Amino acid sequence: MKRLSCLSVVLFSLCATLCAQNNPAPLVYQPLVPASSAPGASGFTLTVNGYGFASGAVLNWNGSPRTTTVLSSSSLQATINSTDVAHIGTANVTVVNPAPGGGASNVVYFPVRQPAAAVAFAPEPGVSPLAGAAVAGDFNGDGILDLVVGQNFNNQTGSISFYRGLGNGTFAAPITSPSTLPVFSLMSGDFNGDGKLDVVIGTFDPNAFTAEAVVFINNGFGHFVQKTPFGGGDDGWLVGVADVNGDGILDALFEGEAQGSGAVQVYLGNGDGTFTLKSQANENNYDANPIGIGDFNGDGKLDIVVTDFDQIDVFLGNGDGTFQPFVPYSCYPCGGSITAADVNGDGKLDLIVGELTVFLGNGDGTFTPGFAYSPSGGGINAVGDFNGDGKLDVVTVGFNVSVYLGNGDGTFQNPTTSGSFTTGATMAVFGDFNRDGQLDVVNWGSPSDQIGLQTTLGLAPGSLSFGSIKIGSTSKGQTITLTNVSSHSVPISSIALTGADPGDFIEHNTCGAGLHVGATCTISVAFKPTVKGTRTASVSITYSGLDSPQTVALSGYGL
């Protein structure tokens, strides 16, 4: 009887340990299969690949559960109804694991749109200058993408501003919460388990001369409450958020300089918005660059990859918040971003680095260098189905937006550029901000930000400068090219000179009443100043599209 009692105690203790094990916070990879749908299509089965799918996991489509079958911890399928794709728009897809632990995954966008042969972006006024960082998400639960922007005031203090999305590419006036520290980086996640998206900032304490992080808890109505700072390296800032130890609580990763060497520091989440330092993975890099996260070797543990100036460093995870020594891979220039996604459809995570180098995953934690594409002027990238053809594309952002359309086999077409942003991007966020089924971009640089809505008509260039011309003389003409990049014919209502000094410019065009799919036309503009000094105007193109009108800025100087 005594032996039986001891055995019972052992079994009870073992059960208590195993039964109390939390489900991980899941991570969804791109692409979804299929990656997009035409409006009005029939219902279909959506396959989702990722990490940490527990028994009982459910796929949410715009926040509503769909019938889900978990195939393995890295794959599941869900039934998508015809009513889900009846109309143009972009669905937010997440996977939710049940308690204990668990919770919602990252959001992956599913465009519902007609496929197009090309993609272009039109710059629109932004929302906030002095931004140190920004993130997009549905922070108030109304189903519309919002922006949270972190400001940096002279590296001393800052603020967190909530911009409620209006669903048409514009945003309401901000609700601002103060920060005692400046904001250098910003990421989102539910850090206290209340179902609302919070934010965590990476910062530098000007008094203590240490890098720190601060969580801001979201009340669901646009206000954020600052928690106690944590961290304390020599330099660096927040570069990743994920459940790296599989306990169902989001963790935070920092990268930069610590104690005289490059390092990735892992802070495990406690589930209440606080964090505890777990480990430090040393590397050669001293800079705080973006980080890619995924299970690269298929062992059910999250791994990370960090960019450097001329290499990427792959750290395989041990599943407890620690990592094995890194393995480097050469690339130049590596750029300012890295994304993990399956770009060739073989079920293995690949890496898209900077602007643009592709490393194809072998499924065992190693990578084969793919093709390095010619730099397009933007080191910040995003991956998604930007033209609705079911294949992953890559978009890079700098002074313009460059689109590399994917071929589905790990290769990409030569980039096309559009946008002509007045500020070179140091950061960018992506999402369908006007709910037209097309993924857009908001970029930040100096001195402000701009919104790039994916457009019906591609326009290049975005501005014309004529220099100095004598009064009464006419400059040589310059040409604007207009291209229909949509999947349907586009009627053009008007092309007109507007702005301060339209009488100082001359415009002729070949566009007629509209453009068929893929067609182009030209607008010729010349400068004929009537008075001395700086003269400005715009060419305004009005057409049938949510992004209409588009404008091209004109400038010249009369002598």
Question: Where are the language model's segments positioned?
Answer:
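Blade-edge motifs of beta-propeller repeat domains
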Residues: R113-P129, R164-L181, I217-D234, L268-Y286, ...
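Beta-strand/beta-sandwich contexts
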Residues: A20-W61, R66, P100-P115, S465-S468, ...
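Glycine-aliphatic tripeptides that mark coil-to-beta-strand junctions in extracellular
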Residues: G143-L145, G195-L197, G248-L250, G300-L302, ...
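Beta-propeller blade termini
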Residues: G132-F139, F184-G193, W237-V244, N289-F296, ...
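Hydrophobic beta-strand segments that make up the repeating blades of beta-propeller
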Residues: L147-Q151, V199-T203, A252-G256, I304-T307, ...
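Short glycine/acidic-enriched loop and turn motifs that connect beta-strands
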Residues: N152-Q156, F204-F209, E257-S261, Q311, ...
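Blade-level signature of beta-propeller repeat domains, shared across WD40, Kelch, NHL, RCC1
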Residues: T426-L457
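Feature for long, exposed domains in two main contexts
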Residues: R66, A99, A118, T455-L559
